[in-house]
Amino acid sequence: MKLTDLSNPAFLENPYPLYETLRAQAPFVSIGPNALMTGRYSLVDSLLHNRNMGKKYIESIRLRYGDTAADMPLFQAFSRMFITINPPAHTHLRGLVMQAFTGRESESMRPLAIDTAHQLIDNFEQKPSVDLVAEFAFPFPMQIICKMMDVDIGDAVTLGMAVSKIAKVLDPSPMSADELVHASTAYEELAQYFTKLIELRRTHPGTDLISMFLRAEEDGEKLTHDEIVSNVIMLLIAGYETTSNMIGNALIALHRHPEQLALLKSDLSLMPQAVSECLRYDGSVQFTMRAAMDDIEVEGELVPRGTVVFLMLGAANRDPAQFTHPDQLDITRKQGRLQSFGAGIHHCLGYRLALIELECALTTLFERLPHLRLAHLDALNWNQRSNLRGVNTLIVDLHAKN
């Protein structure tokens, strides 16, 4: 198996046959020099919780783009994000940012998520059909993030386009020269945008997310300006296409299992379980990477120091050793803990908000558009992102009669 398999068109359309092969081959499969991959749930879970597995972000940039690239403002910004750093810096920074994503803070966003869903549906409800990605799934999470930051909603489209360009930094394959230029330009634009906003919040603080960052303290230390800019951009990246793609993935999964869709529509109180099961069945985030900071032995297998391990979350979520009938969508499933948000110290900080957004988006869609039906279920246009699975378009008939 090779790393390039992750960019194969067949994999991008349906990664799960390759995942089945991966789990069956060996505990770990070599995919290159000092690089391993595993899709077994037990190994993924164990390594995510292992404190000797960490991040080597700048080293990975040098490996993919050369030594001088590590000094580029774009990559330096990513090196300040708490998703790319290790303790103790990670512990301090995550503790500060976490104050904005407690259970209480996340739950307080539910009315906003519901209102945003209704407002978007108002714009297209009377149409016979619509591209749900463009008209609902993409603007939905970005508008919520903008409102959380007290950013002009009119800027949401521009911010979303910039974030999509920057997010390619997180793909395992190097960007092309043109993509790198576009990503760098997009970062500079976002950095300037949020620098102005941060300075405004310093003199006129509010109850928004950026003001919370400025007020947040842990052991008397506040975030620096560069840390705030980097991590505000990180929150845009983490909370945008991961959620927007998952809305589409969930609708596709449910429509491919009509009995589950009918069950959910008959009892929308099942929505939290349905969202969790859709995340397990076909999550938008398919893998994460960790580096061995020391020699590690796990389940009798040695992972040498310096080895980069691709932890295939999508494969772990379909592991029959963890889930009964894993290739079946079952919205009443109570067995097993999904790996879609990772685990350990780098567990997704915004997972509660993501779950709330997905629950509100799907519930509101089914309440307002009970006859919604996907128009081209067998001819979907999957994106070309190995680690951000989703469709580019999703045409739906809004008032289809069965």
Curated annotation (Swiss-Prot):
Protein keywords: Heme, Iron, Metal-binding, Monooxygenase, Oxidoreductase
CDD domains, per database record: CYP164-like
Enzyme Commission code(s) on record: 1.14.-.-
PROSITE patterns named in the record: CYTOCHROME_P450
Cofactor: heme
Primary enzyme class: oxidoreductase
Listed InterPro entries: Cyt_P450 (IPR001128), Cyt_P450_B (IPR002397), Cyt_P450_CS (IPR017972), Cyt_P450_sf (IPR036396)
Keyword Phosphoprotein: no
Keyword Protein biosynthesis: no
Binding annotation for heme: 348
GO molecular function, one term: monooxygenase activity
Highest taxon, organism lineage: Bacteria
Family of the protein in this entry: Belongs to the cytochrome P450 family.
PANTHER family tied to this protein: CYTOCHROME P450 YJIB-RELATED (PTHR46696:SF1), P450, PUTATIVE (EUROFUNG)-RELATED (PTHR46696)
Identification of the protein by name: Putative cytochrome P450 133B1
Organism: Xylella fastidiosa (strain Temecula1 / ATCC 700964)
Name of the gene: cyp133B1
